[in-house]
Amino acid sequence: MSAIAPGLVLLAYLCGSISSAILVCRLAGLPDPRDSGSGNPGATNVLRIGGKGAAVAVLIFDVLKGMLPVWGAWALGLTPFWLGLVAIAACVGHIWPVFFHFRGGKGVATAFGAIAPIGLDLTGVMAGTWLLTILLSGYSSLGAIVSALIAPFYVWWFKPQYTFPVSMLSCLILLRHHDNIQRLWRRQESKIWTREKKKKTPEQK
């Protein structure tokens, strides 16, 4: 199986390079997410500029393009080392997509999809951590950052053989969020439901 492993890594990168945020926005007649809102082609920004339906479509597709390559590689019997490279390649494709001039997103949903095949128990605690952080803080970026920081410890607890590749994924996610970390520190980061609150304010007055 090691002979086909590099090909699967390349395939994962190409899958990751399919930017669902850009494609969904084009199909829905919405602005290019790279030039609107936060400038990030991801589900959160699509939520801001296009609403829940478009955002859900982007989220599902981004998760699947991380999940399916890893599941396929696992079904073919690749070792944890190669599975980790497949997962990282899918996220690298999302972040630096060859089909869209290497201007991609943060890789959070794709990384979650890539980790999901490890097990439902891990998937559950990861999703719970992400959702709870967002509900308590209102910051989508903080949910991603906290989840990325804790993910290696969760994986070490459930499936320790995958700790190293997941740690690499977490480092990649944190590096992509360096601007968000600075804005959070300065209290300049936008909350995920700021737009809805602004819409309600004139009516309340």
Swiss-Prot record:
It catalyses: an acyl phosphate + sn-glycerol 3-phosphate = a 1-acyl-sn-glycero-3-phosphate + phosphate. SMART domains: G3P_acyltransf (SM01207). It is a multi-pass membrane protein. InterPro entries: G3P_acylTferase_PlsY. The chain crosses the membrane at residues 4-24, 80-100, 107-127, 130-150, 155-175. Keywords: Cell inner membrane, Cell membrane, Lipid biosynthesis, Lipid metabolism, Membrane, Phospholipid biosynthesis, Phospholipid metabolism, Transferase, Transmembrane, Transmembrane helix. It comes from the Bacteria. Pathway: Lipid metabolism; phospholipid metabolism. Catalyzes the transfer of an acyl group from acyl-phosphate (acyl-PO(4)) to glycerol-3-phosphate (G3P) to form lysophosphatidic acid (LPA). This enzyme utilizes acyl-phosphate as fatty acyl donor, but not acyl-CoA or acyl-ACP. This is Glycerol-3-phosphate acyltransferase. It comes from Klebsiella pneumoniae subsp. pneumoniae (strain ATCC 700721 / MGH 78578). The lineage of its organism: Bacteria, Pseudomonadati, Pseudomonadota, Gammaproteobacteria, Enterobacterales.
